[in-house]
């Protein structure tokens, strides 16, 4: 059919795909034959052979290290905003929503030379295909800590879900906040569902990144307001932490190159005491920022928008979001 009627073959591909992919996954000799006619489907419902697709994306989707990046989505509607952002950068996105596509992605990465498959929601758009060295967020360490703390304090508690908060410079017109999930960890968990011996990954919590765009006016507004509102309460805490960190570094330096039995017990005890005091001061700092964040509706609204975009806002949290949205309007 492929040779005689390409259009008909494309129309039948979605039905044939699972059988052809299964054959390619289980029989090496079948892969050698099928890779000439097997198709990839993009989010615009266009079909390409492997060779055709490689030619389509090689100019625009090759990273700075020479790797060809195949972007893909697993659900066109749920991942629409990420797909749209990729298209706006001139990228093409594959639709890999089949039953065997998780395994196919891993196999094709091994078969295709210098190629990598990356799900479109696994990182911010500027890092999906690294064209140049990453631009660090234009904030001081203290400012990043404040932003991370206020947003982390308002993240919901979800079963087997963990969030890491990070700051990035994504431009003034970029989205203020978004959630991404590591390609590696997500794929390992998906493989655990279909492959024996990988149950360890299946038991691990889902790890997500909450990315704050420090260039966006709303994030800047939160930072400025938090800085001004908490300044008086934080100053004595930060002064104490600076003093403790200095002493901590001095003790560490004094112990460098020494064996455990060569370090006086008094120094060991002091180092332990300093570390405990540092942890206590950090807890105080986070409590101050958490109390501020609890009264800032913009922070909770931004977090809920990111959760909503990823279909992670449900039940009471969704109802509260709707009520808060009406209040803010």
Report residues per predicted region.
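Conserved GHKL (Bergerat-fold) ATPase module
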Residues: 1-329
């Amino acid at each position: 059919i492929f040779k005689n009627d390409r259009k008909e073959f494309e129309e039948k591909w979605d039905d044939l795909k699972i059988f052809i992919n299964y054959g390619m996954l289980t029989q090496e000799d079948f892969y050698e034959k099928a890779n000439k006619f097997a198709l990839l489907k993009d989010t615009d419902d266009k079909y390409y052979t492997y060779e055709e697709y490689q030619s389509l994306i090689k100019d625009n989707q090759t990273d700075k290290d020479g790797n060809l990046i195949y972007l893909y989505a697993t659900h066109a509607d749920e991942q629409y905003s990420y797909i749209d952002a990729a298209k706006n950068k001139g990228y093409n996105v594959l639709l890999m929503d089949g039953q065997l596509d998780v395994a196919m992605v891993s196999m094709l990465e091994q078969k295709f030379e210098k190629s990598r498959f990356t799900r479109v929601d696994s990182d911010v758009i500027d890092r999906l295909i690294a064209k140049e060295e990453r631009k660090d967020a234009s904030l001081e360490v203290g400012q990043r800590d404040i932003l991370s703390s206020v947003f982390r304090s308002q993240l919901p508690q979800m079963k087997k879900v963990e969030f890491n908060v990070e700051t990035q410079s994504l431009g003034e017109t970029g989205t203020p906040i978004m959630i991404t999930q590591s390609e590696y960890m997500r794929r390992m968990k998906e493989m655990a569902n279909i492959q024996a011996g990988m149950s360890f990954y299946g038991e691990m919590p889902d790890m997500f990144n909450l990315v704050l765009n420090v260039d966006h006016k709303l994030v800047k507004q939160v930072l400025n307001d938090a800085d001004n509102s908490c300044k008086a309460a934080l100053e004595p805490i930060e002064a104490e932490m600076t003093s403790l960190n200095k002493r901590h570094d001095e003790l560490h330096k004094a112990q460098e190159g020494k064996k455990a039995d060569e370090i006086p017990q008094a120094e060991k005890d002091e180092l332990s005491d300093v570390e405990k005091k540092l942890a206590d001061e950090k807890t105080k700092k986070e409590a101050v920022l958490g109390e501020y964040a609890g009264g800032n509706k913009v922070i909770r609204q931004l977090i809920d928008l990111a959760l909503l975009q990823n279909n992670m806002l449900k039940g009471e949290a969704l109802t509260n979001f709707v009520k808060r949205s009406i209040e803010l309007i």
